[in-house]
Amino acid sequence: MKFIIKLFPEITIKSQSVRLRFIKILTGNIRNVLKHYDETLAVVRHWDHIEVRAKDESQRSAIRDALTRIPGIHHILEVEDHAYTDVHNIFEQALALYREQLEGKTFCVRVKRRGKHEFSSQDVERYVGGGLNQHIETARVNLTAPQVTVHLEIEQDRLLLIKGRYEGIGGFPIGTQEDVLSLISGGFDSGVSSYMLMRRGCRVHYCFFNLGGAAHEIGVKQVAHYLWNRFGSSHRVRFIAIDFDPVVGEILEKVDDGQMGVVLKRMMVRAASKIAERYGVQALVTGEALGQVSSQTLTNLRLIDNASDTLILRPLISHDKEHIIKQARELGTEDFAKTMPEYCGVISKSPTVKAVKAKIEAEESHFDFAILERVVSEARNIDIRQIAEQTKQEVVEIETVASFAPTDVLLDIRSPDEQDDKPLELDQIEIKSLPFYKLGTQFGDLDQSKTYLLYCERGVMSRLQALYLREQGFSNVKVYRP
């Protein structure tokens, strides 16, 4: 199989040296992502495109899907690569491939050509289009609004018959910009803002301030791992968890009620800045949007920024909530966010929308900053790829089974797309489908007299979800690993 990767247009307008660097980085990213699917896979870079060739036909759909989620790719062409002898031979090959697709449809032919030939692109379009029109009685030519466009590419002595075109996510390849640290809470905003910086070419590390115990941390780990696995798995990234309960306790005890929200955010920025400095990260990323909550007015945001010299990026600053939720839905993080509690908003009953710097500083003078230093020094840093292994250690009480009893129910928690690609077919056991992002809200509706064996492809999400359900009080869960 062969795929032609077309570059994001902004890459093509860069200077020659920058363009070559971007293409080289994108080629490496593609290799890193796809090596898990086919060890014999080849990735070859060219000036205006990248070729991906693989032998394992069973991985075709998985490879194609992975390519559509790699930043820097504008679109992917799935092609058949053949030799040709002349224009008539090009027509014959196009007829064999497109006959069924064109029956009863209007169509046009579009040709791109590279190299020196005795014919022009228009010559091929006219000859192939005329031939298809003559040989397929129910097909009709329509050059302005065709139902089917026959795409052909001719490269020197090779003919590329384009079987399908699939849109990528665009943006810059990860690694072309500097690293950032995303303050992730698991809600709608932080997930979308993290994705937006990945799409713009940044390697995004994650910093989580734990205010809700083990269940909260597991939930946020799921979101971070999902985002990384789906859009950023070409690079190793860090997940840093900071136990912020002592800081919140100090704020509740020492700070005036109306100033608590701004002070808490300033403490988070200070802590995250120390983490960023420790790992050489250039900027923080937050999901704040102007006026969304009391701490996100211009006055308050300015005071929050002043707590540190580290640059703070807010990609959602002008977005409204409806748009953010729509983006989260498209990314697949909406259902995570729906079940994620918002802890930051509960500590202040009458938050100020226009904090005064002198008053904030006066309130912070009562705060014991040794507590902040301590929680930062105790921050836990893990490679996000180790979340699976860490979960194994945390979930020692979760039983992993390779077989099942007749009364067990196998719960397929993979995404609907994964279930469609590789449906489970097992005898002597009831199989139910409940995607992982719906477990938090719908598991309680299942028959709790039965034992549920959670299944996912690699066992990462099933272990995370098993721990999460145990934290919620459900003891009738196991992990199924055949």
From Swiss-Prot:
Q: List the disulfide bonds.
A: C344-C456
Ligand binding (ATP): L183, I184, K265, G287, Q296
**Where is this protein found?**
Cytoplasm
Record-listed E.C. numbers: 2.8.1.4
Q: What does this protein do?
A: Catalyzes the ATP-dependent transfer of a sulfur to tRNA to produce 4-thiouridine in position 8 of tRNAs, which functions as a near-UV photosensor. Also catalyzes the transfer of sulfur to the sulfur carrier protein ThiS, forming ThiS-thiocarboxylate. This is a step in the synthesis of thiazole, in the thiamine biosynthesis pathway. The sulfur is donated as persulfide by IscS.
Is RNA-binding found in the keyword set? Answer: yes
Please give the GO cellular component terms listed in this UniProt entry: cytosol
Give the pathway: Cofactor biosynthesis; thiamine diphosphate biosynthesis
Q: Which UniProt keywords apply?
A: ATP-binding, Cytoplasm, Disulfide bond, Nucleotide-binding, Redox-active center, RNA-binding, Thiamine biosynthesis, Transferase, tRNA-binding
Official protein name in the record: tRNA sulfurtransferase
Gene field: thiI
| Residues the record marks as active site | C456 (cysteine persulfide intermediate)
**Predominant cellular place of this UniProt entry's protein:** cytoplasm
Q: Give the similarity note.
A: Belongs to the ThiI family.
Q: Which GO terms describe its biological process?
A: thiamine biosynthetic process; thiamine diphosphate biosynthetic process; thiazole biosynthetic process; tRNA 4-thiouridine biosynthesis
Listed transmembrane segments: none
- Tell me where in this chain the THUMP domain is found: 61-165
Q: Which reaction does it catalyse?
A: [ThiI sulfur-carrier protein]-S-sulfanyl-L-cysteine + a uridine in tRNA + 2 reduced [2Fe-2S]-[ferredoxin] + ATP + H(+) = [ThiI sulfur-carrier protein]-L-cysteine + a 4-thiouridine in tRNA + 2 oxidized [2Fe-2S]-[ferredoxin] + AMP + diphosphate; [ThiS sulfur-carrier protein]-C-terminal Gly-Gly-AMP + S-sulfanyl-L-cysteinyl-[cysteine desulfurase] + AH2 = [ThiS sulfur-carrier protein]-C-terminal-Gly-aminoethanethioate + L-cysteinyl-[cysteine desulfurase] + A + AMP + 2 H(+)
What Gene3D superfamilies is this protein classified in?
3.30.2130.30, HUPs, Rhodanese-like domain
Domain (Rhodanese) spans 404-482
Q: Pfam families attached here?
A: ThiI, ThiI_fer, THUMP
